Amino acid sequence: MGIIAHGIDLVDFPRIEDMVKRHGERFLDRVFTASEQQYANSNKNGIEKLAGRFAAKEAVLKLVGTGWRGKIAWTDIEVVNTETGQPQVKLSGEVKKIADKLGITQISVSITHTANFAIASAVALAESNGHK
């Protein structure tokens, strides 16, 4: 299994907090799945958690080489946690189609937070270096 792409993103908490204040449920439902929202709501640092997931989604869009455009929906990328707390990416829709076409079999993601920022790094893996 080899690394075929990498994406990274940095998001400041005030940016996400402002979007939530200005657009409320419309923003949340457009960008985050129900389980991502539930995870943030169940955490005292909800904005930080949303910012981390937003950064992870941006990092994934960078590694598939598209950015957010066309038929791609933010909710095509869902960030969940394993039982041990490790973030994990689930793809669907247009992003899944693009990842499959690129030969991506797994995406490893890491999210960290500072006092004001969330940073996410995503690495795309393929079965072999002879990816599509």
Which functions belong to the PLM regions below?
Residues 1-132:
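Core catalytic alpha/beta fold that binds nucleotide/phospho-ligands
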